[in-house]
Each structure stands twice: as structure tokens, then as C-alpha cells.
Design a protein with these regions (language model features):
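Serine-dependent carboxylesterase/thioesterase catalytic core
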Residues: 1-9, 22-24
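A conserved short beta-strand
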Residues: 10-20
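Extracytoplasmic/secreted proteins, especially bacterial periplasmic and envelope-associated proteins
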Residues: 11, 53, 57, 109, ...
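Alpha/beta-hydrolase-fold catalytic nucleophile elbow
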Residues: 18-19, 41, 71-72
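Acidic catalytic loop of the alpha/beta-hydrolase fold
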Residues: 22-24, 45-49, 76-77
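Short alpha-helix in the alpha/beta-hydrolase fold that links the catalytic acid
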Residues: 29-30, 36, 50-60, 83
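Short beta-strand/loop motif that positions the catalytic acidic residue
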Residues: 34, 40-42
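Catalytic active-site module of serine/aspartate enzymes centered on a nucleophile-bearing elbow/loop
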Residues: 74, 84-128
């Protein structure tokens, strides 16, 4: 059986990965052909994607060290922007952060960090 080449979308010049799932399914060389800068975020208190099987597995599989961020006191759903009152009423599990975690303040910091990462990673004239 012929060996297939990894699929690649050359338009993607950098990526931000947040709360990466399924990292444990990667083969040791599963991400060896990733050649773009990566920013990788993990919530330290994520009980749905516990450390080290998910984001850490992705981090270790990347050929180049990513800009790796671990958010203290954050849970699984804290990467979702603050919920509206209506959504909070029907989906409190995804809208309520850990005690003492300020989701709105975190998203201000998160947004700045993501924009700064793309500013560093994407060079003029690199468009698809």
C-alpha cells in the first residue's frame, strides 16, 4: 500500500490551539510535519481534558516548541467568552467559572496574547 503524504493547507501560516482534545491519540510522529508557529493554551483546572493526556500530548508531538500557556484556576469552559444572561440561564455548566476566576478579565488578556502571537508569527506578504 502506498504511503500517503500528510495533508497540508498552505494558507495556514500560524495557529492558536485552545483546550486541545484527543492529544493522546497522536502517534509519536503525528505532528512532525507541522511547520507553522503554534500557540497552545491549556486550562490548569480542566477536569474534562486532564493533564497530561491532551494539550501536553500535543505540545510534546510538535516538532518545534509552541508558545505554551497554562491558565491558572481556569476550567474547561473558561476559554468560552463570558455568556449572556440568557445563555447563563439555560447552560450554567458552561457559563460558570471556578470560584475566583474572572472570565471577562481573562478574555481581555487572552485576546491581547493571541493578537500579539499572530502579529509575531505572521509576516507581511505571507498571505495564502
Amino acid at each position: 500500500m502506498p504511503v500517503s503524504r500528510p495533508w497540508q493547507d498552505r494558507r495556514i501560516k500560524a495557529a492558536v490551539l485552545v483546550a486541545s482534545a484527543m492529544g493522546f491519540t497522536l502517534s509519536p510522529n503525528g505532528l512532525k510535519d507541522v511547520k507553522v508557529p503554534i500557540q497552545l493554551w491549556r486550562a490548569k483546572e480542566d477536569v474534562f481534558l486532564p493533564h497530561p493526556r491532551y494539550a501536553e500530548a500535543v505540545r510534546k508531538a510538535l516538532p518545534e516548541a509552541p508558545d505554551y500557556r497554562v491558565v491558572a484556576n481556569a476550567g474547561r469552559f473558561d476559554f468560552i467568552p463570558p455568556c449572556s444572561k440568557a445563555l447563563s440561564g439555560i447552560a450554567p455548566a458552561i457559563c460558570t467559572g471556578a470560584p475566583g476566576f474572572d472570565r471577562a478579565a481573562f478574555h481581555q488578556t487572552f485576546n491581547v496574547a493571541v493578537i500579539a502571537f499572530f502579529g509575531r508569527a505572521l509576516k507581511p506578504g505571507q498571505a495564502g
